[in-house]
A protein has these predicted regions:
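Extracellular polysaccharide-recognition and catalytic grooves
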Residues: 200-345
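Extracellular glycan-targeting catalytic surfaces
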Residues: 1-236, 298
Length: 345
């Protein structure tokens, strides 16, 4: 972190200028065709907006350069990015359409946001303003860019429209949001003192993110819990409902996670009633999806207890049975069977 802090001290925009943004076009609309990025456009926002990633999958002909090799403020009239051609010796930099880059655009932004988050943590720990300046520059640029960006439109008018996030093709892979939330939390007092007029923008960006995760996704399986985790984390760093003109603050989003259901986002209680067998505690998906679900519920138990002093196990007694049933997935050699996305680790 200190390496980038020193660079930022000598050139204030060194790190933030390497974010993947629509620096020149300020595009507000993003258009995809199924699982592939097509183009960006729409009205010009008052500030640079966040670039959308290339594809739903990870396959890419062009990879992102090292951070120091990223072209600052990289944006041309064709909407291309300057990335490395993986097929050529030396991986030379080329201007390439984002659809050739897999998920590297969002990953680049996550790397930069991660550096900013670590700097925010160091500021919170030490009080040294140099860390706050680095973190705030990146955070302000990125979150303002999220605030003015709209949810992507699928030109194929297909199922993908119900899955897209603001930065990723799946709402369950809005990885940047997992980084932004603690960044905001650690940096909150500094932002409130130095960016007071932007606090409503930051909250608006977080709420837009959460609202889209609620609106999209899959409600009746493991996706729902992954979505709920994002929404819960946003709720915990917002102010009370009364602080926002739309009445949507901390209580609103936490209540949505616990008690409310919509077409693509079920409450924790409704999902548990639907997914766990009342007699055995077995989850209605194959392993390892089932083990992931139990782990996520256990994390929610801890989160509710730590932050809200609320006993989720008392509210959902089936969780005790589900945890106790977990060893039943093991073979005698302590291995488990797995289907789908199950990973050996």
């Amino acid at each position: 972190t200190d390496v980038y802090t020193r660079r930022t001290e000598s050139q204030s925009d060194w790190l933030l200028s390497r974010l993947a943004m629509y620096w020149k076009s300020h595009a507000t609309e993003v258009y995809v065709k199924g699982e592939v990025f097509d183009h960006a456009g729409g009205e010009k926002a008052p500030a640079p907006t966040v670039r959308y990633t290339g594809t739903r999958g990870t396959a890419a002909t062009h990879g992102r350069p090292k951070l120091e090799d990223i072209v600052p403020y990289d944006d041309n009239e064709d909407g291309n990015v300057t990335f490395c051609n993986n097929a050529l010796e030396g991986r030379p930099l080329e201007s390439v359409h984002p659809s050739k880059t897999g998920r590297n655009i969002e990953n680049l932004n996550c790397e930069i946001l991660g550096i900013a988050r670590d700097a925010a943590f160091l500021y919170w720990m030490t009080g040294e303003e140099k860390y706050a300046k680095l973190a705030a520059g990146v955070f302000d640029t990125y979150m303002t860019g999220i605030y003015y960006r709209k949810v992507p439109v699928d030109l194929n008018h297909g199922h993908q429209q119900t899955l897209v996030g603001l930065t990723s093709f799946e709402v369950i892979h809005e990885d940047a949001l997992h980084i932004v939330v603690p960044l905001y939390d650690f940096l909150y007092n500094y932002l409130k003192s130095n960016y007071p007029d932007k606090m409503i923008i930051y909250a608006g960006a977080l709420k837009k993110w959460a609202d889209n995760i609620i609106a999209n996704g899959v409600p009746h399986n493991n996706w729902d819990l992954l979505q709920a985790r994002y929404v819960m984390n946003v709720g915990l760093v917002l102010e009370d409902n009364k602080e926002y003109t739309d009445g949507k603050g901390r209580e609103y989003y936490i209540d949505y996670v616990m008690n409310r259901s919509s077409i693509r986002q079920w409450s924790l209680t409704r999902l548990a009633d639907y997914g766990f067998d009342i007699n055995t505690g077995i989850w209605a998906e194959c392993p390892g999806y089932s083990s992931v679900v139990i782990n996520d519920y256990a994390n929610f138990v801890n989160q509710f207890d730590t932050n809200l002093q609320y006993d989720l196990v008392k509210a959902m007694p089936i969780l005790s049975k589900a945890v106790a049933t977990t060893p039943e997935y093991l073979f005698p050699n302590r291995m488990i069977c797995g289907f789908g996305d199950t990973h050996p680790g």
